[in-house]
Amino acid sequence: NLYQFKNMIHCTVPSRPWWHFADYGCYCGRGGKGTPVDDLDRCCQVHDNCYEKAGKMGCWPYLTLYKYKCSQGKLTCSGGNSKCGAAVCNCDLVAANCFAGARYIDANYNINFKKRCQ
């Protein structure tokens, strides 16, 4: 669920508050459209698409609980998750790892969505 995703982000990117990823580019946060502004925004676009796919499986990605571990910045999803738990955990794990490898550009935080995301 979103609370667990927030904690995953903190695991892989402890140096930056999670809310910096909640209003970034065209895809991090409020849904998304248009062309991603950078690699970090592409991480969010992939995450959105992953959640959409999980939804088509009958899952509720924003609410689905799952089990995972964080150890020294490394995430693993537990093997005992339900079908939906496994799918959503994987979506969140891939995104959190992607965030860790992408450059954060301050100018792409809280951008003018109407102008830049068409």
Swiss-Prot record:
A biological-process GO annotation: lipid catabolic process
Active site annotation, chain numbering: 47, 92
Cofactor: Ca(2+)
Catalytic activity: a 1,2-diacyl-sn-glycero-3-phosphocholine + H2O = a 1-acyl-sn-glycero-3-phosphocholine + a fatty acid + H(+)
Disulfide cysteine pairs (residue numbers): 11-70, 26-117, 28-44, 43-98, 50-91, 59-84, 77-89
Motif (Coagulation factor Xa binding motif): 52-69
SUPFAM superfamilies xref list: Phospholipase A2, PLA2
E.C. numbers: 3.1.1.4
UniProt-annotated location(s): Secreted
Tissue and organ distribution: Expressed by the venom gland.
Single GO MF descriptor: calcium-dependent phospholipase A2 activity
SMART domains: PA2c
Residues noted as binding Ca(2+) in the record, renumbered to the chain: 27, 29, 31, 48
PANTHER family associated with the record: PHOSPHOLIPASE A2 A2-ACTITOXIN-UCS2A-LIKE, PHOSPHOLIPASE A2 FAMILY MEMBER
Function of the molecule: Snake venom phospholipase A2 (PLA2) that shows strong anticoagulant activity. Binds directly with the coagulation factor FXa (F10) and blocks the formation of the prothombinase complex. Acts by a nonenzymatic mechanism. Also inhibits the complex composed of tissue factor (F3) and coagulation factor VIIa (F7) (TF-VIIa complex) by both enzymatic and nonenzymatic mechanisms. PLA2 catalyzes the calcium-dependent hydrolysis of the 2-acyl groups in 3-sn-phosphoglycerides.
More details: Negative results: does not bind to coagulation factor FVa (F5) or prothrombin.
Protein name (Swiss-Prot/TrEMBL): Phospholipase A2 'basic'
